[in-house]
Amino acid sequence: MARVKRALNAQKKRRTVLKASKGYRGQRSRLYRKAKEQQLHSLTYAYRDRRARKGEFRKLWISRINAAARANDITYNRLIQGLKAAGVEVDRKNLAEIAVSDPAAFTALVEVAKAALPEDVNAPSGEAA
């Protein structure tokens, strides 16, 4: 059987792994085995956190909407309920952007939501107390 020399392939493989692990701390950026292990973990974290980022942004949008809504004397929950009742279809991302960049438009949306809400939410649906 012929002898297989893999020096160039192995060097190239190690070089690419070490290049990708540049910026890691300590041995993880200098030793091939440690760098390879860290790279596998890094890819796992990146995959996981790309999905987690979506939830984090939603939390941020809700916080911004709630802060702007409370400045207009309504809670986030009642605002969303009122917008749904009024048939206003605006997602949380755009609602947060409006709250930050255009407070007058957000105030108009709050007024629409307040108008669509019933007076007493806890009252039975057939009779108003």
Swiss-Prot record:
PROSITE patterns: RIBOSOMAL_L20 (PS00937)
Main function: Binds directly to 23S ribosomal RNA and is necessary for the in vitro assembly process of the 50S ribosomal subunit. It is not involved in the protein synthesizing functions of that subunit.
Originating organism: Mycolicibacterium vanbaalenii (strain DSM 7251 / JCM 13017 / BCRC 16820 / KCTC 9966 / NRRL B-24157 / PYR-1) (Mycobacterium vanbaalenii)
Cited HAMAP family: Ribosomal_bL20
Bilayer-crossing regions: none
Family matches, as InterPro entries: Ribosomal_bL20 (IPR005813), RIBOSOMAL_L20_CS (IPR049946), Ribosomal_protein_bL20_C (IPR035566)
Keyword Hydrolase (UniProt): no
One Gene Ontology molecular-function label: structural constituent of ribosome
Record's signal peptide: none
Similarity-based family: Belongs to the bacterial ribosomal protein bL20 family.
Highest taxon in the source lineage: Bacteria
UniProt-listed Pfam families: Ribosomal_L20 (PF00453)
A Gene Ontology BP annotation from the UniProt entry: translation
Protein name as annotated: Large ribosomal subunit protein bL20
Keywords assigned by UniProt, alphabetized: Ribonucleoprotein, Ribosomal protein, RNA-binding, rRNA-binding
Keyword rRNA-binding: yes
Cellular component GO terms held in the UniProt record: ribonucleoprotein complex; ribosome
